[in-house]
Amino acid sequence: MIDRPNDALTLTLPDGSTRTVPYGTLPRDVVASIGAGLLRAALAVEVNGTVQDLVTPLRTGGTFRVLTERDAKALDVLRHSAAHVLATAVRRLRPQAKIGFGPAIEDGFYYDFEVDEPFTPEDLAAFEAEMRKVVAEKYPFVREEVNRQEAERRFVDDPLKLERLAELGDDEIISVYTDGPFVDLCRGPHVPDTSRIKHFKLMHTAPAYWRGDERRQQLQRIYGTAWFTKEELDAYLHRLEEARRRDHRVLGKELDLFSTDQRVGAGLILWHPRGAIVRNEIETFERELILRHGYELVYTPHVVNEKLFEISGHLVNFAENMFGPIEVEGTNYRPKPMNCPGHICIYQSHQRSYRDLPLRFAEFGTVYRYERSGVLHGMLRVRGFTQDDAHVFCTPEQVPEEIARLLELVDEMLTVFGYPYTIELSTRPENALGTPEVWERAERTLAQVLEARGQAYTIDAGGGAFYGPKLDFKLIDAIGRKWQGPTVQLDFNLPERFGLEYIGADNAAHRPVMLHRVLVGSMERFVGGLIEHYAGAFPLWLAPEQLRVIPITDEVRDAAAAVAARAKEAGLRVLLDDRAQTLNYRIAEAERLKTPYMAVIGKREVEAGTVALREHRLGRTQKPQILGVDELLARLTHEVATRALPGAHGPAAGSGAQAAAD
């Protein structure tokens, strides 16, 4: 509840004590009353879950927490402030540059500028040096609240700012921040002064359309990163270098996994034979898993009468992400962006009884979503992708058990791929369908199931889908990055919109609850993420080529061919490399393609009935293992059958892969 100007505000501190202060008190005064040392360390505060800086007047009471460098939420404040320091530096060196906006983003910040010529690497170096001068000058971030006329006067030479001002409602507070001579239209929050921004680096520049609209002017966006310590900055730069080494677009080409072709269309993936093997293995594994968990497979069309999406609400709430209509015989059809309406139609094809529930429909369904060309990114951001969609139709009483089953399914799936994960509970967005009461009930149900299982989670306020709250699983890859993973969504709205029913034990009609879930989500994105997670060196069960048999000389070729034939009969994907190339060349070729195992066979191995086994993961300097052919095949087939992670030579470690919540 927003307090009135004449109200006293009650603030509850983390230790349970309270402070009563007048409306409009500055947070820094509250922090000072707690302790001078805390004030020196304070960067911002959090009031009722909302972060604000130390100079924004308090307008509401509630929980009050001081943010210091030790708090993850303070990092966004630091980075937003670094964006302002960047704009200050650019304005000093390029006074004619028109300023856009500069938010904090994951791992850093950016700022948009309208300039006559694109920025160069030399420009970035000069801007970064100037930023260090601004930091050294220790300018305080001074906040002012101004009326519209004063704001327009201050930004008369900045048309991008004037455009934003024109959109603000009459009752909105207009605030500006200055650091030294630079002034910016901004809501904050900011750190107390520029000297707090010590460890930063400008990364690169790229064109960006104003407000992401390709019909608008193109700006120059400068990206940067900022951290509280030099060690954190250095570690981040190292991760970036490692990420470049793992880039799925580069590895996808080197390993011949996938490609795109402008003749096919932007954002549409062509799966090559080697990539198709990886995808097929994942789908086969997941199909076995979900059938064991009680799902039934279904298929729905790629193109659907758009009236179905009017009923579902997608045409109103998701239209900008849908492809345009295709008119056929007076009826408009759309490439489907979602599989759920089709599954609902299957549910409604029969009268359902409570004895039929829960019903669990699953589909590897290809969907199509419009993305601007500027945001397309390899396999990670595409326009057509296959989604492992499933929908559970159940009674309200069955919801907790079904969610618990889904959590077990997700954990079993992710453990096989070696992903730790965190869970976010995403709550009601602004464009939500349904009443707040329905949403609160759904959110409470998800939270209660997580808490009953002892699973840690964080809240992503406003991050739910328009038809229901969801659990988002964030996968943590080998270099610590987070990826979008499985989702579980609780939906009371679509059953209402479609009029779904089942006949209860009382012989009356009742409304079922619908659960949406994906495990890998977009198959394209998941495989792209796996390529980077494994750096292209897939576990044996996923590897396009599992074993390469290499005869040292022509004299042992037939014996090597016999080993390759036995491996193929055992179900392994094997290649016999008997080319007239040197042994080192052929080993290097297998290493380049990240083939997990190489069986090198010479005269000595033929006589002993053995192979010299090399593992890709052990590198070029390893000493080969001498194994009998039977032992080799037993080991590799066991590793495939158990879907072992590299180096395990057995089943993947058990469940419990959830990482600590942030």
What annotation goes with each model-predicted range?
Residues 1-100, 106, 112-662:
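NTP/phosphate- and nucleic-acid-binding module
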